[in-house]
Amino acid sequence: MDSHSSHLNAANRSRSSQTPSPSHSASASVTSSLHKRKLAATTAANAAASEDHAPPSSSFPPSSFSADTRDGALTSNDELESISARGADTDSDPDESEDIVVDDDEDEFAPEQDQDSSIRTFTAARLDSSSGVNGSSRNTKLKTESSTVKLESSDGGKDGGSSVVGTGVSGTVGGSSISGLVPKDESVKVLAENFQTSGAYIAREEALKREEQAGRLKFVCYSNDSIDEHMMCLIGLKNIFARQLPNMPKEYIVRLLMDRKHKSVMVLRGNLVVGGITYRPYHSQKFGEIAFCAITADEQVKGYGTRLMNHLKQHARDVDGLTHFLTYADNNAVGYFVKQGFTKEIYLEKDVWHGFIKDYDGGLLMECKIDPKLPYTDLSSMIRQQRKAIDERIRELSNCQNVYPKIEFLKNEAGIPRKIIKVEEIRGLREAGWTPDQWGHTRFKLFNGSADMVTNQKQLNALMRALLKTMQDHADAWPFKEPVDSRDVPDYYDIIKDPIDLKVIAKRVESEQYYVTLDMFVADARRMFNNCRTYNSPDTIYYKCATRLETHFHSKVQAGLQSGAKSQ
């Protein structure tokens, strides 16, 4: 494809040599100086690009959505600010400034003179008029208009399949003090109301859906159609990508973004671009290629990325007729794309996509299939209906919705209950299906199952007393006979949060009320040994005592179980 042609002669870089950026980008480094950009654009003019097929390999490594998507910052209007500053300091014509930014586009689309002229005319008019609005400076106005876009890594691209050239998820804080925006408290309140009952995903989706219905949020799909309003949004989005993907040459971002074969789905808050995804649909092949993606930093972790991707999926399916998305991801991006429904296995036939997307060294090709029936922009309603249906079915089979008053359960110092509460006295237990034969259920087969519960409990207490005595009489039991004194070991209880010792175990055994199963007794003994090994290093006497005593204890437990089985 022409938008992915290697028009910039940048050296290939492996992902291991790149420094991870908060923008989830793994692309080549940005040419920072104006001279380099013009030189790269001149070089691009000499490169031959195929109209329908991508070159065999790309000089840029695959860009990605990194794991720090939600924390990445992406600013906007950075490029426009520099243009404005140059215009203020020099006598250069605004057209010249625009040529600097859209150099690659002019070379690539030289036959399309109307596109070039419209971009230059639009930018010149915008730069000339921006300085007089509300008495603000040109730079301030431009910052407000092209605030950055960020994309969350929460939900993602099930839309389909082509390689990601400059995918980045993140954004800069832009325009947080702009008048006319709804206070953030309202969104927070809506999320708080729905979070407990609906879950985080549904709460965010429904909150953003309400903002859409109220007209505060708008999702649009624009391309380079020479309409001023659309071009303003695209330039704002371009600045987001440029800031979000610092290793990606700005000329390359402009080239893909302004390519008329690419489309950009954007989320707007008022007239401010908040986020966007640029992709190229291959209608004849029924798959799409995501190129860039970003959301402003101050709007992250609010569900914008999820909502944006859902709109992209629905638009790609309903308007473009796509069934898949493909994308190249680096190591930082794989986790994000998995959350968006992408898989590492490519099920789409290779003949469908091979030759249409670029191959990247070190990138992992991932695929996402677009469901033909899912209402992507109304998933929260569908999930709520499904959850309601499941709850109603559960209520038909269970009385779990009944909540009974709590019971009073007081304990002594060793955790021994002051008052014995019979299990059958616990309200709702029988209604839940409990039966008396389940009392004292244990994975250890101790005694005759035909004996009554009282007899079994007496036999259990006798076994636990015998096991306790074997531990107390063992030569390695001395570190465990008393609780650890915090005056001798000040930090012990900072490290060991659930201490236990033979003295506490003895009190619980003698009460004949605490250990109702052998499992509970064995669990306390194991915790005592594990606490010792957690605090002490392996070369200490305490660590070795714990290991030897534990071995002795387990051998006695097995012997007791075997003798009990023989007595039956």
From Swiss-Prot:
Residues 222-371 form the N-acetyltransferase domain. One of its GO terms (molecular function) is histone H3 acetyltransferase activity. It is an enzyme of class 2 (transferase). It is found in: Nucleus. Acetyl-CoA binds at residues 293-295, 300-306, 332-335. GO terms for cellular component: histone acetyltransferase complex; nucleus. Gene3D superfamilies: 3.40.630.30, Bromodomain-like (1.20.920.10). Residues 455-560 form the Bromo domain. Histone acetyltransferase activity stimulated by the presence of ADA2 proteins. InterPro entries: Acyl_CoA_acyltransferase, Bromodomain, Bromodomain-like_sf, Bromodomain_CS, GCN5, GNAT_dom. Disulfide bonds: none annotated. Its EC number is 2.3.1.48. One of its GO terms (biological process) is positive regulation of DNA-templated transcription. Residues 13-33, 40-66 have a biased composition (Low complexity). Interacts in vitro with ADA2a, ADA2b and the transcriptional activator DREB1B/CBF1. Interacts with PP2C1. Binds to EML. Acetylates histone H3 and ADA2 proteins in vitro. Acetylates 'Lys-14' of histone H3. Acetylation of histones gives a specific tag for epigenetic transcription activation. Operates in concert with certain DNA-binding transcriptional activators. Acts via the formation of large multiprotein complexes that modify the chromatin. The N-terminal part (1-150) is not required for interactions with the ADA2 proteins. Belongs to the acetyltransferase family. GCN5 subfamily. This is Histone acetyltransferase GCN5. It comes from Arabidopsis thaliana. The gene is HAG1.
